Amino acid sequence: MTKGDWEAVIGLEVHAQVSSKTKLFSSSSTEFGAEHNTQVSLVDAAMPGTLPILNYYSIEQAIRTGLALSAEINKSSYFDRKNYFYPDLPQGYQITQFFEPIVKNGRIFINNNKKEVRIARIHLEQDAGKSIHEESKTYVDLNRAGVALMEIVSEPDLRSSEEAAEFMKKLRQILRYIGSCDGDMEKGSLRCDANVSVRPKGSSTFGTRCEIKNLNSICYIMQAIDYEIQRQIEILESGEKISQDTLLFDVSLGKTKVMRNKEDASDYRYFPEPDLLPVEISQDKIDSIRSSLPELPDQKKLRYIRELSINKYDADVITSDKAIANYFEELIKKHDSKLAVTWLTVELFGRLNKAGIDIVSSPIKANALSELLDFIVDGTISARLGKQVFDIMFETGKPASLIIKEQDLKQITDKGQISEIIDKIINDNQDKVQEYQNGKTKLYGFFVGEVMKLTKGKASPDVVNFILSEKLSS
């Protein structure tokens, strides 16, 4: 069999950190980057006699996420203990939701909304701490222990690393739009485990799956899945069997490595958490959260295409990130959508990309660009001068009004003044006027250039064209 005779079957378990200032069962801060073990309560450290107190904000964010993914909200859910030993898990168990998750049966569309990927469940659970390894010692940092995670579990509907990457991008986009997770993979706010197996094309039987743990970038997700697919194909084609293992992806080697044999649910001895009551959610609460959801990216994109006549590519770019969409929305409060698209996606993005920064860090905020567009639209400056002003704004952070005043860039629109300048140019270049009138029409650009030279680019192009064409044809 060749590689084309095999089909990959992939499911993702995504761990999304809830955008909450406190942990799931304690009031400890979740701020990133604090000194080791400075954000640890007695509950987080599992001191005997301490009891968990549920953070209901995390419950609301899980419901919010479920509704954004068109899922069912379980009106009665509860927490369970997942029993295992690990140095950075001080309780000796993790509080999670195994039997009755808060959300089930959702979906995400990928491949231009042509493919549905089913979401089996979303449940809340505690994050573990972090082990820090040095040469002969291992340190444990419990700052992360107890942080609220949403585990978003897909069905095995993905068939390639590209689809897995698109699923992650789409999920991250939705989470950022609704504000339930910041989606920052570099800080570990969003990471995933990939369950990968292969089977002969056309088969409906699942192969033996391996789980690749803790993938924290889109690039690594694709590399790890591609390597694992090829590894499993080679094993099967050599006549051997796949071992159901838990794997780690070695970034430096670009290979997966066995971490341990994969456990089954029975190995964790799940049982209901005795220190927490069931979570009861009313329909009124669900409806209230639903009504607070913002316009989601697919809805926004469709509106831009249908109502604002923006092409699909630009609509995709603008809605790809909530911050970009918000910036654009600010611009179109006062300006034509096509003008806003050009200045956002061409002028601003060009400068941001060159500087290596994103729109959140842009030195030019939406209201500042909107003011610049005001001056272009009302004729105070030309579009050409507008780009010059924009460059200075980007470098200095100064408002357009101040730059125009300081640089004396206000456009000359006085017809009498421009007419006098054109008369002088015509009188000084009679030979070229004769050539133009004899059919050498390309010389028109020469006359425009001379006007701009004498006015330092400040003459209104519309006024120049109107007067110049009239004088050259007479």
Curated annotation (Swiss-Prot):
Allows the formation of correctly charged Asn-tRNA(Asn) or Gln-tRNA(Gln) through the transamidation of misacylated Asp-tRNA(Asn) or Glu-tRNA(Gln) in organisms which lack either or both of asparaginyl-tRNA or glutaminyl-tRNA synthetases. The reaction takes place in the presence of glutamine and ATP through an activated phospho-Asp-tRNA(Asn) or phospho-Glu-tRNA(Gln). Pfam families: GatB_N, GatB_Yqey. The gene is gatB. The keyword Protein biosynthesis applies. Belongs to the GatB/GatE family. GatB subfamily. It catalyses: L-glutamyl-tRNA(Gln) + L-glutamine + ATP + H2O = L-glutaminyl-tRNA(Gln) + L-glutamate + ADP + phosphate + H(+); L-aspartyl-tRNA(Asn) + L-glutamine + ATP + H2O = L-asparaginyl-tRNA(Asn) + L-glutamate + ADP + phosphate + 2 H(+). This is Aspartyl/glutamyl-tRNA(Asn/Gln) amidotransferase subunit B. GO terms for molecular function: asparaginyl-tRNA synthase (glutamine-hydrolyzing) activity; ATP binding; glutaminyl-tRNA synthase (glutamine-hydrolyzing) activity. Keywords: ATP-binding, Ligase, Nucleotide-binding, Protein biosynthesis.
